Every structure is written in C-alpha cells, then in structure tokens.
C-alpha cells in the first residue's frame, strides 16, 4: 500500500505566490546535482483512507477500514555520494514526527523518541538503512523512516535531456519505485511533462506533472498504483522544492482479484539551506552497536537490544521469542525468582529436556559468569539430533529482584557468529516498570 505518512498541508498559493509566465520558446535542462555538505529543510505530509481484506488467524476474512495521517519535519545534510554521484548517505535531524492511523477501529500512533532524532540514513539501491547516533531504534521507528520518500532519489522525474514546454518523457523506474514503495516494480507507465516555467515569488520555477500507473509487489502482496501529481523545480538553486502526489493503491490477491483500495495525498516541501563544511568525524559508519534495535513493549515486562538480522516472532507478559534463521532461535523468559535458586537447577532442567529429545551430547561447558555483567551466567552444549549438529546456549540472569532465563539454538557451523549476537542480547536485558 502507499505508506507515505504525512498530512497534506497546503494546496493553495498566497497572493504573492502567483506565477508569472516566461517565454515558451526556450529549451530547459532540469536536473539536480548534490555535493557533500548540501543541506535541506524537508517537511512532508500524508493523508490516506481506504479498506482492505484481512484474514485473522483461524477466522473468516473481513474488510477493515484504514485511515492515517502524519507530519514530519527535519533537516537533511548530504554526507557522501556513490560512484554515479547519487546520494548514498545523509544525516537527518528531526524536529517533528507525528504518525497516527486507525486500523479496524483501533488507534495506533508512532513517534520518534527524543534520543533517536539525530540519525544517519544509508541508501543502497531502493533500500534505506537508518541508524541513530545516540540510541537503538525500535522496529516501528525503523519502519517509519525506511518507508518515507527519499527526495534525493526522485531525479527520475526530471527530463533526461533538454526539453521544451509541453514535452513529455517516461519517469525513471527508480523514482517510481521510491514514490510507490513497491519492493518489486514489475511495470511502470508513468509519464512526466514540463507544464510551465514561471516566476514564482520572483524565482524562476519549473512545474513538471506526472501521471500513470505502476504495478508490483509490496509487503501486502500484488499491488497496482495510480499516480497523479506534480513537482516544482527551483531553476536558481536547481533543486526540487515541492512535490504533490495523489495516489490510489489497489491491493490484489494471488489470482489478481482486487481485495482492497487505499487513496492518499502526499506532499514534500523542500528548502535549500546554507551548506556546511564536513570533517572526517561527520562520515558516520554503521557498526554492530549503532545498528542494534530496541525491543520495548507495553505487553512485556522487559526490554532488550537485538541485531537487525534477528526478528521478534512472539511476545507475552513474561516471554519473547526471536529467530535469526530456520535453525537459529532464542527464547527469553522472565522467571519467578524462587523457581531457580541456582543456575545449576536451570542447567539440570535443560539437560533433562536434551535427553528427552534424544539429543547426543558431543561437548559441554561448565557454568561460567559473563565478564562485566554481574548476575549473568551461561553454559552450553554441542549436540547432534537427527543428523544435525546444533549448538545450545543458555543463560541465567539475576538483576535486582528479577530473574531471566535464555535458551538458544543454532547450527554448530554458525555458532561463532551467532554466539556474540546472543551474548549481546543477554547483556542488554532490562526489567521495565511493568515487572515491578
């Protein structure tokens, strides 16, 4: 579906903003170029509504209503370009992020916490990878940023050559994919046209319209989108200064039958700011620490950090499960402190489970403390079951009046890599207010 999450703020123009036409005889070369240190203030807004077919577990399918709106305001500084001179890294400083939606009558809100409002955004092809410099992002924060339009990726809306008024060209596929948020773009018939070049508020400004259809696959499945919009291009600073999009997303099932329809409006207002001088300290790189995610839920009595290649698959008041692959998983349980008076009791219970499953133990470790984390102990076994060689790693963590156990599994071939992931997760567990 179209996931642009901001409320349309202005469509009318104030009296001093009326355009004054220029000569129609010229040819125009309209394109953006970027340099490290370029800065923009960007304000985006979305409003959407519609319905889609939803199938709850073990229940019949039903149509649910969807409404949403959002407003986002941030400064973006260009950090680096790739070999084709496209922006592949930028620094964002958010002033405002507000997203709300109603899904089947349930209200949902997403915000950016103050400690993650400065972040770096990496772009690799159509993928956007944000990470914060101050604290781990939650999955909702990550999803919010990576599904927002990246204005620097809209160069395909500009003509690939010099054009005259009313001349048309096909929109670039990369820009269509950016606007539609399709994970796989299968076809595009989006056409752009230079409508006018006018003096707008005493600045030479080009208006480019775009209209058409695009089809592909997003997280909801097969999808067709209908686009109708326009952009303003500031001919003096040579940057996209405004975008308006009216879009319709038609959701389809595997047979190609329509199962939902969502309509929305999206705007980008973009102002060029004075450039800044970058130093080597400004070229931030992702690493295992700054790309971690934060798991924190009202339903669960603890929080923890985890790598992005892991996925939280279930949660309850006292448990959370994570998967990294088909053969790598982790179960975290908040225990009653009286259940295990020693780590040896937990090890004996785990050993009984291993024997019940008829696993053959090939190697085992003693119970050991984790350096630097008081109250955290671990033990492990290398086992074989049904021809598979697995590594089982367990933790007991006592912190204050709380106790946690962790049980994990992975293949023996991957244990060196995954062991450090699981150790990091265990080290990061913290009881929340709900646990007290």
Please place each PLM-identified region on the residue numbering:
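N-terminal export signals
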Residues: 6-23
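Acidic, serine/threonine-rich low-complexity disordered tracts
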Residues: 24-115, 121, 163, 171-291, ...
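Short alpha-helix capping/helix-loop boundary micro-motifs
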Residues: 26-28, 153-157
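Short, structured beta-strand/loop micro-motifs enriched in basic residues and often containing a Trp
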Residues: 145-154
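Short, well-ordered beta-strand elements
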Residues: 243, 392-393, 402-411, 429
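Secretory pathway targeting signatures of secreted, lumenal, and periplasmic proteins
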Residues: 298-354, 382-386
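Soluble non-cytosolic domains of exported or imported proteins
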Residues: 301, 412, 416-420
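Signature of long, low-cysteine stretches enriched in small and polar/charged residues
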Residues: 349-403
């Amino acid at each position: 579906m179209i996931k642009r999450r901001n409320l349309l703020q202005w469509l009318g123009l104030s009296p001093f903003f009326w355009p004054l036409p220029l000569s129609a005889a010229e040819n125009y070369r309209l394109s953006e170029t970027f340099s490290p240190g370029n800065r923009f203030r960007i304000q985006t807004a979305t409003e959407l509504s519609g319905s889609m077919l939803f199938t709850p577990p073990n229940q019949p399918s039903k149509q649910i209503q969807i409404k949403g709106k959002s407003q986002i305001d941030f400064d973006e500084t260009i950090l680096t370009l790739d070999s084709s001179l496209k922006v592949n890294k930028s620094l964002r400083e958010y002033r405002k992020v507000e997203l709300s939606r109603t899904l089947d009558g349930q209200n949902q809100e997403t915000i950016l916490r103050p400690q993650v409002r400065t972040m770096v955004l990496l772009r690799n092809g159509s993928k956007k990878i944000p990470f914060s410099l101050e604290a781990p992002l939650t999955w909702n924060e990550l999803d919010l940023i990576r599904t927002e339009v990246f204005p620097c990726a809209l160069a395909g809306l500009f003509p690939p050559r010099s054009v005259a008024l009313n001349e048309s060209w096909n929109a670039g596929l990369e820009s269509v994919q950016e606007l539609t948020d399709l994970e796989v773009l299968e076809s595009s018939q989006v056409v752009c046209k230079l409508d006018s070049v006018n003096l707008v508020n005493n600045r030479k400004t080009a208006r480019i319209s775009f209209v058409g259809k695009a089809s592909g696959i997003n997280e909801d499945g097969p999808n067709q989108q209908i686009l109708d919009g326009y952009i303003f291009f500031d001919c003096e600073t040579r940057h996209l200064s405004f975008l308006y999009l009216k879009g319709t997303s038609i959701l389809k099932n595997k047979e190609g039958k329509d199962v939902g329809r969502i309509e929305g409006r999206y705007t980008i207002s973009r102002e060029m700011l004075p450039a800044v001088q970058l130093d080597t300290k400004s070229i931030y790189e992702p690493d295992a620490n700054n790309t971690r995610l934060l798991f924190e839920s009202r339903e669960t009595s603890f929080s923890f950090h985890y790598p992005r290649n892991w996925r939280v698959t279930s949660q309850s008041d006292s448990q959370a499960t994570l998967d990294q692959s088909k053969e790598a998983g982790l179960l975290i349980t908040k225990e009653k402190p009286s259940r295990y008076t020693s780590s040896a009791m937990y090890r004996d219970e785990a050993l009984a489970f291993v024997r019940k499953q008829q696993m053959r133990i090939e190697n085992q470790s003693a119970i050991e403390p984790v350096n630097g984390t008081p109250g955290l102990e671990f033990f492990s076994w290398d086992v074989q079951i049904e021809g598979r060689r697995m590594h089982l790693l367990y933790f007991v963590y006592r912190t204050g009046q709380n106790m946690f156990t962790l049980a994990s599994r992975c293949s023996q071939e991957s244990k060196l890599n995954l062991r450090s992931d699981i150790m990091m997760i265990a080290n990061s567990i913290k009881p929340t207010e709900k646990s007290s």
